């Protein structure tokens, strides 16, 4: 994806895994990484299985899941990543993952119930938030896109006052609030719009990001 977008060059950095990883695209080097302890990953896999929910995580190069299903196929249509199916996850996890994601394509209420049941255990350990109506993200406590924006500015010695961020889902709110200018897409959730300084006239599928670049970067 970085190559397709022309971002694999000097001066380009990627914040991945909802803030769990900061990557120097040109040097192909990890600058900052936060991970989920394996004991927590085991609990999440166990509890999602009990709830009848699909869950996957990641290695450095692949998506890791217990079984490939409709959720895997839909997810990888948008996120092009190799898939490794391993029924013995999480026992076979070689290293702590940056994030885990729970997916239900048809029953949001089931995920809401799982989230509510997990919150007492997750407090102080794991942050949970939606990145789409069907994707419930799990990252280490205090990891977010907002924290990652601040960390990247610190690493590059760039004032936070010189930052612009844009998004449309719950996992984008911390970043929108952290940046000097936070923009919400026209199709963003109400909570995202409430946190933003600017709401685009176009949605994310119709040049919403280009609108922000023209207004706040190229003007």
Provide a role label for each language-model segment.
Residues 137-219:
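Mg2+-dependent phosphoryl-transfer enzymes with acidic/Ser/Thr/Gly-rich catalytic loops
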Residues 7-8, 94, 157, 193:
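Alpha-helix termination/capping residues and helix-transition junctions
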Residues 3-6, 49, 115-120, 150, ...:
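Class I S-adenosyl-L-methionine
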Residues 8-10, 18, 122-124, 178-179, ...:
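Short, structured coil segments at secondary-structure junctions
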Residues 1-72:
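Active-site phosphate-binding/coordination module
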Residues 21-23, 64, 109, 137, ...:
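Flexible, glycine-rich phosphate/dinucleotide-binding loops
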Residues 47-166:
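Conserved acidic, metal-coordinating active-site core of Asp-based
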């Amino acid at each position: 994806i970085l190559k397709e977008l022309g971002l694999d060059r000097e001066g380009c950095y990627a914040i991945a895994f909802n803030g769990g990883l900061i990557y120097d695209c040109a040097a192909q080097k990890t600058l900052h990484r936060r991970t989920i302890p394996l004991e927590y990953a085991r609990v999440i896999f166990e509890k999602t299985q009990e709830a009848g929910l699909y869950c996957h995580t990641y290695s450095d190069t692949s998506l890791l899941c217990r079984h490939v299903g409709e959720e895997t196929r839909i997810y990888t249509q948008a996120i092009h990543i190799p898939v490794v199916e391993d029924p013995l996850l999480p026992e076979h996890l070689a290293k702590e993952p940056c994030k885990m994601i729970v997916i239900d394509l048809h029953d949001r209420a089931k995920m809401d119930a799982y989230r509510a049941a997990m919150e007492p255990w997750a407090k102080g350990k794991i942050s949970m938030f939606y990145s789409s109506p069907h994707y419930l993200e799990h990252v280490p406590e205090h990891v977010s896109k907002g924290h990652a924006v601040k960390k990247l500015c610190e690493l590059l010695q760039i004032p936070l006052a010189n930052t612009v961020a844009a998004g449309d889902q719950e996992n984008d709110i911390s970043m929108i609030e952290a940046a000097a200018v936070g923009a919400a897409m026209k199709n963003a959730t109400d909570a995202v719009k409430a946190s933003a300084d600017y709401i685009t006239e176009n949605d994310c599928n119709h040049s919403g990001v280009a609108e922000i670049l023209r207004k706040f970067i190229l003007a």
